[in-house]
Regions:
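A short, proline-enriched helix->beta-strand linker immediately N-terminal to the Walker B motif
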Residues: 148-152
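Helix-to-loop junction immediately C-terminal to a conserved catalytic motif
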Residues: 48
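Conserved ABC transporter NBD signature motif
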Residues: 56-64, 76, 108-110, 117
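ABC ATPase NBD coupling module
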Residues: 64-84, 112, 124-127, 220-226
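Conserved ABC ATPase signature
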Residues: 129-133, 137
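Catalytic Walker B motif of ABC-type/P-loop ATPase nucleotide-binding domains
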Residues: 154-158
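The feature captures the beta-strand-to-loop junction immediately N-terminal to the Walker
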Residues: 33-35
Length: 234
């Protein structure tokens, strides 16, 4: 599904990613865990095409997309939900969804029904402005917008930030359901140990722009590993 080899990226003259290698199989959920400033968001931005790599390659379903623009990656099955809620706050929930329908040229009535089946929380909110939604509701809307295009690979950047625990549990259930119903592949970056352990089949630790270790979800609670690689231990 996704093959990343020797990926490097920089902001100006400051290198951020230092040769990342990662292979993700179809239907796999892979987590990337690490401190702020270690390159998690930069890695996702480089994968989706918002930041041009300075070295290495990215392949999606056997196709080299290293130089492909972000919008084409989106149309070729790669979805991205950035940190901080990717919605239009001045528009209603329904109009936010309609933008995604138009972008992906899908039938509104059919896809809206499918969206509300997966995200029932949005049904009574369709006429509300995005700005009045809670942080959790905004995140669910951002996720729903992204999935309107039926991506095969979904990139999630810290989706639990600032969200109440009940909606975090709801998002976990939604994503687990999509794994079964759509065989969705996910690359998830997070600092929430419980969230990443609940969803990921394997977890990579990122440190100073490199993937330095791979662990199973049940190893995340090893205090020595957490302190050594992430600094989140007690």
């Amino acid at each position: 599904m996704l093959a990343v080899a020797g990926l490097k990226a920089a902001y100006g003259r400051i290198p951020i990613l230092h040769g990342i290698d990662l292979n993700v199989a179809e239907g796999e959920f892979v987590g990337i865990l690490g401190h702020n400033g270690m390159g998690k968001t930069t890695f996702l931005k480089t994968l989706i095409g918002l930041l041009r790599p300075t070295g290495g390659s990215i392949e999606l379903n056997g196709k080299n997309i290293t130089r492909m623009p972000a919008y084409k990656r989106n149309l070729n099955g790669m979805g991205y939900v950035p940190q901080g809620r990717d919605i239009f706050p001045n528009l209603t929930v329904l109009d936010n969804l309609r933008i995604a329908f138009a972008m992906h040229k899908v039938e509104e009535e059919k896809v809206l029904e499918e969206v509300l089946e997966v995200f029932p929380r949005l049904k009574p909110l369709l006429e509300r402005s995005g700005r009045v939604l809670s942080g959790g509701e905004q995140q669910i809307l951002a996720l729903a917008r992204c999935l309107c295009g039926s991506p095969s690979l979904l990139l999630l950047d810290e989706p639990t930030e600032g969200i109440q625990p009940s909606i975090i549990e709801e998002i976990i259930e939604i994503l687990q359901g999509l794994r079964t119903s759509r065989n969705l592949t996910i690359v998830l970056v997070e600092q929430n140990l419980d969230f990443i352990a609940s969803l990921s089949q394997r977890v990579h630790i990122i440190q100073r722009g490199q993937l330095v270790n791979e662990v199973s979800p049940d190893q995340l609670y090893n205090p020595e590993l957490v302190r050594e690689f992430v600094g989140m231990g007690g």
